[in-house]
Amino acid sequence: MATNVVSQEQDAIALEVQITAPPDRVFQAITDPSQMLRWWGQQGIYHSTKWCTDVRPGGQWSCHGVSDADGSAYQVSGEYLEVDPPRLLSHTWVASWSGPMKTVVRWELQPTAGGTLVRVNHSGFAGAPAAAKGHYEGWVRVLGWMQAFVETGETVASRPAVSVPKN
């Protein structure tokens, strides 16, 4: 996977990846709960157990899952702010492991000769550098998983497990 770090400032994370698929295919992968359940996660790290999406401005989304390191449950949820298929999606992000912090994720999908340039900007980490670092590491993994799913059909079940130290 060729994820480029555009910037990793204290307040925001920006990454991009080129995917060899059209923007509508990528947009489906990041909005269709049945597809997200298939690719978002990796054995040994965490796995999603339920995704819900109401993809419209003001609509809600949520992901429930389990950490493979310690078996603890997690939830990430938010509200869609902008929805312009298949080129733009933005939503709030509230993660159970980050306390009450509400951040914003913006996906931009730009058609290219080779498929789609995906840009992800996750902002709102002012005063929380550890949270920014953790989310940066997470987004690098997530974009790789999504790219592998869209380009090759790789799923959580078919992806090799990793060994993560238990807490």
Model region roles, listed by residue range:
Residues A14, S34-A73, S158-N167:
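Short beta-edge strand/loop motif at the mouth of beta-sheet-based domains
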Residues P23-D24, D54-P57, L81-R87, E108-L117:
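A short, structured loop/turn motif at beta-sheet edges
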Residues E16, L88-V140:
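Beta-strand/loop substructures that line and gate deep hydrophobic ligand-binding cavities in soluble
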Residues V26-F27, M36, W61, Y80, ...:
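Hydrophobic pocket/interface hotspot
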Residues G124-N167:
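A conserved amphipathic terminal alpha-helix motif
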Residues S72-S77, M101:
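Short coil-to-beta-strand transition motifs
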